[in-house]
């Protein structure tokens, strides 16, 4: 089954202005080299243990839970053990990838772009763990009773978000699109959930399944709008260091085969996928099965009829995902948010290994890996 480690996260937050938040977010990207200077290489090296950073509370990385609890990696990945390291947001995983403390990271689009832009350790985005037109990570939720009915009503208010995440990027995009001024308060996602449930904050941006816990499970809030209203997609991504891909290609490729199998389970056997995912103690302790099911399979219908989630893997065949990762996302993070000081080179977004995994898997399974691998 593998071991599990956890990186603790603070529960509190501090009120900061938009400008100070942007400056701090920029330091996140630019300061990575300071935090990990002198560290090179990957965690795998000559070891037979593969270290994987995953997010137990992130619906667009639910495939990782299916791989873990279904032990799907055992058939495809030539290692003796997988060490599972749980995180609550992508930024710690970016640091761990750069410092060589982990071999593979599941994360949202914002930290994935930051990973690809770093200049210390070559990292590649190798595939998607999930995709939607703003229905998973680009979510604005308001507490019950809050006098907020439209994006314009956010002007002059305090808005809560976890800094450095895909939801943070969406908030900045909304501010830019609406021409509003807000006070951004940086809070860890669990603190956001607690404060929305208690009514101590009015509005927050976040991701699933945490937002669904507030809205559906606890009945303490409502979705105000999503990324679909701004044609802002969101996605989960898998990031690997070049060292793993080049020195242990069968391990890297094998993991992508396991990912494809997990997507097949999610797409064709939803009850089995839920059975496996709910074995994650951190998830099942806080969320009921119905809530998790809703985040994966039940459309929000807040901004049109956008699908809740697509179980896609190859970003190169899904134009909005490709544009977000390689064009609009990096440009926004560099020019508007000052989070990165360069846009990632094109070779940092690599779908070739996934193509190889799909081709090989076609001869190994009875289902069509291209259905979950390539086609939108």
Provide a role label for each language-model segment:
Residues 5-29, 35-36:
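N-terminal secretory signal peptides and thylakoid transit peptides that target proteins
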Residues 59, 248-336:
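Secondary-structure end/capping motifs
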Residues 188-285:
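Pocket-lining segment of extracytoplasmic ligand-binding domains
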Residues 71-79, 130-133, 228-230, 300-319:
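Short, solvent-exposed loop/beta-turn-alpha elements that line the ligand-binding surface or hinge
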Residues 46-177, 184-186, 202-205, 375:
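Short, glycine-/small- and polar/acidic-enriched structural segments
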Residues 123-132, 183, 220-233:
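Short beta-strand->loop
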Residues 322-376:
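Conserved C-terminal helix/tail region of periplasmic/extracytoplasmic solute-binding proteins
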């Amino acid at each position: 089954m593998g071991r599990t480690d956890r990186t603790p996260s603070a529960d509190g937050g501090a009120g900061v202005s938009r400008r100070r938040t942007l400056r701090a977010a920029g330091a996140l990207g630019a300061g990575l080299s300071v935090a990990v200077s002198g560290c090179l290489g990957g965690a795998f090296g000559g070891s037979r243990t593969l270290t994987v950073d995953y997010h137990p509370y992130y619906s667009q990385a639910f495939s990782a839970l299916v791989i873990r609890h279904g032990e799907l990696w055992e058939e495809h990945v030539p290692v003796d053990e997988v060490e599972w390291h749980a995180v609550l947001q992508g930024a710690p995983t970016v640091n761990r990838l750069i410092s060589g403390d982990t071999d593979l990271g599941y994360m949202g689009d914002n930290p994935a772009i930051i990973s690809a832009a770093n200049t210390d350790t070559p990292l590649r985005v190798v595939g998607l763990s999930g995709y939607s037109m703003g229905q998973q990570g680009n979510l604005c939720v308001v507490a019950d009773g809050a006098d907020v009915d439209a994006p314009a009503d956010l002007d002059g208010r305090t808005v809560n978000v976890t800094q450095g995440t895909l939801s943070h990027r969406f908030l900045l995009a909304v501010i830019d699109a609406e021409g509003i001024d807000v006070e951004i308060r940086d809070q860890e996602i669990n603190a956001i959930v607690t404060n929305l449930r208690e009514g101590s904050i009015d509005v927050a941006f976040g991701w699933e399944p945490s937002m669904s816990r507030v809205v559906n499970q606890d009945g303490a809030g409502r979705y105000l709008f999503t990324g679909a209203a701004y044609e802002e997609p969101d996605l989960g991504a898998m990031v690997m260091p070049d060292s793993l891909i080049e020195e242990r290609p069968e391990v890297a490729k094998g993991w992508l085969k396991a990912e494809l199998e997990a997507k097949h389970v999610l797409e064709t056997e939803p009850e089995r996928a839920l059975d496996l995912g709910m074995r994650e103690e951190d998830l099942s302790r806080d969320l009921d099965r119905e809530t998790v099911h809703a985040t994966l399979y039940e459309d929000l219908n807040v901004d049109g009829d956008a699908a809740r989630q697509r179980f896609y893997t190859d970003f190169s065949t899904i134009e909005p995902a490709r544009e977000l990762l390689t064009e609009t996302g990096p440009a926004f993070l560099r020019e508007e948010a000052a989070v990165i000081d360069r846009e990632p080179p094109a070779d940092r977004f690599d779908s070739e290994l996934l193509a190889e995994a799909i081709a090989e898997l076609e001869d190994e399974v009875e289902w069509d890996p291209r259905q979950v691998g390539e086609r939108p």
